[in-house]
Amino acid sequence: GFVAGLHSFMREARLQAQFSHPALLEVYRVWEQNGTAYMAMRYYRGVTLREMLRTNPQIATEQWLCETLDPILLALQELHNEKCYHRDIAPDNILVLPNGRSVLMDFGAARRIIGGMTRALTTVLKPGYAPIEQYSDDGSMQQGAWTDIYAVGGVLYHAMTGKVPVQAISRMMNDPLKPVAAAARGE
């Protein structure tokens, strides 16, 4: 209930506040007061990558994608160096600012790995962007940096083809995912 949600919010906010990278949301302060929790963060004006691709799909040139996603990959490197994994990367969690800078949002699924185990393992996934290990609800499949990199690959596929990738679970047998070149041509 509420208490579990409060603890989850505080865990997310504190984790996010530990990092300082231009492609990560900047958290100024996290605190509990009046029986609830607060997170003061920088205000960002922008549009999600999902919305940008929906309204202007031609924007997704190779150069634009490199300029947009390189900062995200560098931010992920910083997270991964600290054994922290975002686990929810998708076009709706990438904000593109008016100056073209991109920012990775929503640390709700992020977990820090301690001793090979994630704290409070939960099944969190975004169909099309989540690798197969995120479909395991018993924690039997290990997650790591590759989990986030798979999701970035899904974001690239979506940007280049205009289509959400086929879910990882559906790709296990007789993979129906079209190669990006064929899908981009509409084949």
Provide a role label for each language-model segment.
Residues 30:
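Activation-segment/catalytic-loop signature of the eukaryotic protein kinase fold
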Residues 68-69:
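Activation segment signature within eukaryotic-like protein kinase domains
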Residues 1-18:
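AlphaC helix of the eukaryotic protein kinase fold
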Residues 128-187:
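C-terminal lobe helix-coil module of Hanks-type protein kinase domains
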Residues 34-48, 52:
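Conserved short submotifs of the Hanks-type protein kinase catalytic core
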Residues 96-100:
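Activation-loop N-terminal segment of eukaryotic-like protein kinases
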Residues 72-84:
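Protein kinase catalytic-loop region centered on the HRD/HxD motif
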